């Protein structure tokens, strides 16, 4: 009589999750040196097998062009030899970061003589659901391995060939370094059914992190039974206060909007105090025009745009709620700082908001009242980034309040546990 394995009745996604859970248990106690050796092996393998990766990526790019995909999306999808080498360099940067696992968060000797320590431990199995950029495959795997986690990767169908090749290289390197290869897996299947199954793998997958557009994130948050860390969209604001330095305000505005408009920390709305609007807006509109930005203006901004060279269209309600990720920005004049805050509270995604002001009182009030992951004073919204904050690489930028908020580095990929050490202590 043939004895069936429990795996025989499982779907491929569930099997992968069980393998990841077993791998996570093996990873958790490993010392930093062994994890770093695996990461160095990954970096070397990426460089050695660059041609294999680029060839696989070319299939995705060709398919995207045939489907009429925009050049902006194709650029994010494309891997060149230079980009693969840059990804390998990023992995080596992760090696240099401190290992958070085992860090004592707090500890003390209790009055009864018990030694109590709270220490960082891996989350376990991390699922990443993401869109077109295949570099996320390697970034996520490197950060999860460094923090002692197994990772289940579900990229978009548009990058299937690229992700398959990358994960093959990653698994070979990890296994060759003596770590469990199942610590890095691509979720089987290209259909949405595999995504739904991953989202319902509670008990096997410890956390899901979606990275992508608003629709993807909303779907994961609403449908997942696995706990989710929401890396929200970036409807970021720049508020120019009545007491702003105008030269500084123009520089911050243009950098926030136009340096790299397709990322989540670019500014999507400009708010200008009415007392400075007549002096500031003509300059700002011309600068935005020079940067190629279209302005979606309220009626008060439109009044200052008549003699401007800017491309200006009338704003609708939808504009205040839009993450453009393009050379577009919404703009409004507000009566006061408090009205700016009210606008932000109504429309912001909770990512990053900036104030430009020379008034310490205004800056203090703005930072106290605005409830976003990052509030910048006289600085661009573009600084909300793990690398810019000195955290090294990041898994995403969380816009929720539980577990992690803001750029998520290695410590945010850990939880904690308490270690209680006694000498025959019993509770009476």
UniProtKB/Swiss-Prot annotation:
SUPFAM superfamilies assigned: ALDH-like
Pathway in which the depicted protein is active: Amino-acid biosynthesis; L-proline biosynthesis; L-glutamate 5-semialdehyde from L-glutamate: step 2/2
Broad enzyme group: oxidoreductase
Keywords: Amino-acid biosynthesis, Cytoplasm, NADP, Oxidoreductase, Proline biosynthesis
Record-level GO cellular component terms: cytoplasm
Record-annotated disulphide pairs: none
GO function terms (MF aspect): glutamate-5-semialdehyde dehydrogenase activity; NADP binding
UniProt EC number: 1.2.1.41
Catalytic activity: L-glutamate 5-semialdehyde + phosphate + NADP(+) = L-glutamyl 5-phosphate + NADPH + H(+)
Compartments it resides in: Cytoplasm
GO biological process terms held by the UniProt record: L-proline biosynthetic process
Primary localization class, coarse: cytoplasm
UniProt cross-references to PANTHER family, sorted A to Z: DELTA-1-PYRROLINE-5-CARBOXYLATE SYNTHASE, GLUTAMATE SEMIALDEHYDE DEHYDROGENASE
Similarity section: Belongs to the gamma-glutamyl phosphate reductase family.
Role description: Catalyzes the NADPH-dependent reduction of L-glutamate 5-phosphate into L-glutamate 5-semialdehyde and phosphate. The product spontaneously undergoes cyclization to form 1-pyrroline-5-carboxylate.
Protein name: Gamma-glutamyl phosphate reductase
């Amino acid at each position: 009589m043939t004895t069936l394995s429990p795996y025989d009745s499982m779907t491929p996604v569930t099997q992968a999750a069980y393998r990841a859970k077993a791998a996570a248990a093996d990873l958790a106690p490993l010392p930093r040196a062994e994890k770093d050796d695996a990461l160095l092996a990954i970096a070397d393998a990426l460089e050695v097998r660059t041609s294999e990766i680029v060839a696989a990526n070319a299939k995705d790019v060709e398919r995207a062009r045939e489907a009429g995909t925009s050049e902006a999306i194709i650029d994010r999808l494309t891997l060149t030899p230079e980009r693969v080498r840059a990804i390998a360099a990023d992995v080596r940067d992760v090696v240099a970061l401190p290992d958070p696992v085992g860090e004592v968060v707090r500890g003390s000797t209790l009055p009864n003589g018990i030694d109590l320590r709270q220490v960082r431990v891996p989350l376990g199995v991390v699922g990443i659901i993401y869109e077109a950029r295949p570099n996320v495959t390697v970034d996520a795997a490197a950060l999860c391995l460094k923090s002692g986690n197994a990772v289940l990767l579900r990229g978009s169908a548009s990058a299937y060939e690229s992700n398959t090749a990358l994960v093959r290289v990653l698994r070979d390197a990890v296994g060759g370094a003596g770590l469990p290869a199942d610590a890095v897996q691509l979720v089987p299947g290209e259909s949405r059914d595999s995504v739904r199954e991953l989202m319902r793998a509670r008990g096997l997958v410890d956390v899901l992190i979606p990275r992508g557009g608003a629709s993807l994130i909303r779907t994961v948050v609403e449908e997942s039974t696995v706990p989710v860390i929401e890396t929200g969209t970036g409807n970021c604001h720049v508020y120019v206060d009545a007491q702003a330095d105008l030269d500084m305000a123009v520089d911050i505005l243009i950098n926030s909007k136009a340096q790299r408009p397709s990322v989540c920390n670019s500014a999507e709305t400009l708010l200008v105090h009415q007392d400075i609007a007549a002096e500031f807006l003509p300059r700002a509109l011309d600068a935005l025009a020079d940067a190629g930005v279209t302005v979606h203006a309220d009626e008060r901004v439109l009044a200052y745009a008549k003699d401007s060279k800017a491309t200006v269209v009338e704003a609708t309600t939808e504009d205040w709620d839009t993450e453009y990720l393009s050379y577009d920005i919404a703009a409004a004049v507000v009566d006061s700082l408090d009205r700016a805050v009210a606008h932000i509270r109504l429309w912001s995604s909770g990512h990053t908001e900036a104030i430009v002001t020379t008034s310490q009182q205004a800056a203090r009030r703005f930072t106290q009242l605005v409830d976003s992951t990052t509030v910048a004073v006289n600085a661009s919204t573009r600084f909300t980034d793990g690398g810019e904050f000195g955290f090294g690489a990041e898994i995403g930028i969380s816009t929720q309040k539980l577990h992690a908020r803001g750029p998520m580095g290695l410590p945010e990929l850990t939880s904690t546990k308490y270690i209680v050490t006694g000498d025959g202590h019993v509770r009476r």
